[in-house]
Amino acid sequence: MAFFLALVAFIGYLNDGADFYNNYVKQKRAEDGLEMINTGVSIQHVKSIFGPPIREEHQLDKGVHQYLYSFKNFYLQVVYDNNNTVVFFSVTSKNEEFKPKIPYLTRFVDDKFVSSTLGHTFEEYSDSSNFIWSSLTSKFFDYYEYIYLGNPGNYRNLYFGFNPAGIEYSETVILSERENPSQVALDKFRKSASPNTYGVGEYLGDHNGPETMFGIGIDYYNARDLPEHLY
């Protein structure tokens, strides 16, 4: 009997180790996969990297569709059109230790340019930006902006946001003016607040166009409704 119990315990240990390894490999593959996608690629390419989405939505009348993925360290949002071409994707961090690279953006550190990552303030990414929207409800605060990349980013928009479904890299700061905020209010907010979300638009895209049809980053209530939050 003692031998049998020991054998069961050993098998359980092996299974736990295998589960940990498989989860680690899956997570590592997902994180590495972020550097393998961009707008303009096929949605099938995205599925080949990340697998089937945990949630999908379709706005058939507008010709755009959304896949949502949830991994240990981040949410991934992918928007594509009727031609199966990705027109937008965003990453929202779920872990303050997870600081993914931001496409097209570099910082000058120690006499050299290095890839920018999440974990810095809005102002550190760009001295100026274009305000999109911000809101404050009884449940959450959010904020979103974009910068136009021009030639270095192949004429795309790069989006940043504080998404309430994501992690707080720094103490939450509330924008004092949320409807048509003044430049003074924006500057004060951007100096101390940190985005937890970045998004990449399509070539020659419009911030009022298909690329933001589903918003920027996973919807707060959609995130709360995922199976991972049930138990």
Model-predicted regions and their roles:
Residues 1-20:
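Hydrophobic, helix-forming membrane-interacting segments
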Residues 12, 20-23, 68, 202, ...:
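Intrinsically disordered, low-complexity N-terminal regions enriched in serine/proline/glycine
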Residues 19-110:
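Short N-terminal edge-element motif at the start of the domain
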Residues 91-231:
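Non-cytosolic coordination micro-motifs
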